[in-house]
């Protein structure tokens, strides 16, 4: 009887793990927080591994276990507490509660000495209410500014409700170069019909910020997202959004974006609440 009870407990609660060597996938990007010298001037040990890269690592156990049930019908709230640096080992732990409705997964990305550098709570097969069901009419399209005409962000400019210029990107899958940079080996992203990687989608949240404003070094700190459908080779994604909030905390200037990713057929792909420090305090 005790053995049977233990077996049931193991079925409804499981721990999935994944190890990977962190890579600074944006060392040459416009955002110089990923550059060793610039990051050091802000008090870091080197260029920061991008938050979207850490997020990609954190999705591996949940996608390996649940596949499309998460990629097309799941959510995640992820926060980045401390940076990873290039070459460090990342241990991802995903504690799955199969008894919850919807299924819940508590995820940590641990670095040196077991420190949780990032944490997340995910749900599977979830049409969660915490972000609300998106309506296309709430996310109007708008033109992007010219690269050379992008304004420098400020609290006076980043007013809640301000509409962002729409970013449109075609998809060509599988993106083998990106998968190699992430050391990603799950066949769902490489075998036909390949689906877009979570890294690809959340990277668009960064890109719409960069294409709307002329930024100095900046830091992605958190994202709350819910997946509504997958997107595949040949589709075109438009990223629409607005400013949700702008505030100062401990000398850092933050911006919060409310974004909707839409396929060319009008299908909602993902809604994202994306949070970044657009102007870090100087050390």
Annotated model-derived regions:
Residues 3-20, 82-155, 227-283:
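HotDog/MaoC-like acyl-thioester-processing domains
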Residues 53-96, 100, 119, 198-243, ...:
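Hydrophobic beta-strand-centered segment that forms part of the acyl-chain substrate-binding groove
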Residues 3, 8-73, 129-222, 283:
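Hot-dog-fold acyl-thioester-processing enzymes
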């Amino acid at each position: 009887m005790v053995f049977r009870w233990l077996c049931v407990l193991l079925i409804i609660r499981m721990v999935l793990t994944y190890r990977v060597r962190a890579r600074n996938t944006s060392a040459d990007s416009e955002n110089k927080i990923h550059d060793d010298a610039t990051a050091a001037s802000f008090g870091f040990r080197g260029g920061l591994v991008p938050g979207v890269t850490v997020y990609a690592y954190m999705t591996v156990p949940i996608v390996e276990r649940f596949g499309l049930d998460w990629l097309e019908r799941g959510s995640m709230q992820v926060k980045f507490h401390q940076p990873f640096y290039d070459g460090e080992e990342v241990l991802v732990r995903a504690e799955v509660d199969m008894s919850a409705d919807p299924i819940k997964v508590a995820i940590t990305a641990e670095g040196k000495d077991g420190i949780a550098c990032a944490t997340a709570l995910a749900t599977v097969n979830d049409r969660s209410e915490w972000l609300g069901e998106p309506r296309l009419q709430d996310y109007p399209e708008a033109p992007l500014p010219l690269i050379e005409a992008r304004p420098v962000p400020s609290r006076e400019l980043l007013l809640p409700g301000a509409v962002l210029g729409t970013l449109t990107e075609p998809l060509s899958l599988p993106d083998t170069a990106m998968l190699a940079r992430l050391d990603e080996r799950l066949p769902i992203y490489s075998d036909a019909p390949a689906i877009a990687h979570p890294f690809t989608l959340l990277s668009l949240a960064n890109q719409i910020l960069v294409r709307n404003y002329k930024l100095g070094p900046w830091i992605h700190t958190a994202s709350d997202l819910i997946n509504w459908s997958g997107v595949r080779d040949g589709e075109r994604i438009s990223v629409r959004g607005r400013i949700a909030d702008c505030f100062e905390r401990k000398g850092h200037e933050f911006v919060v974006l409310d974004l909707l990713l839409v396929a060319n057929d009008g299908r909602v792909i993902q809604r994202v609440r994306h949070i970044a420090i657009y102007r870090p305090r100087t050390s």
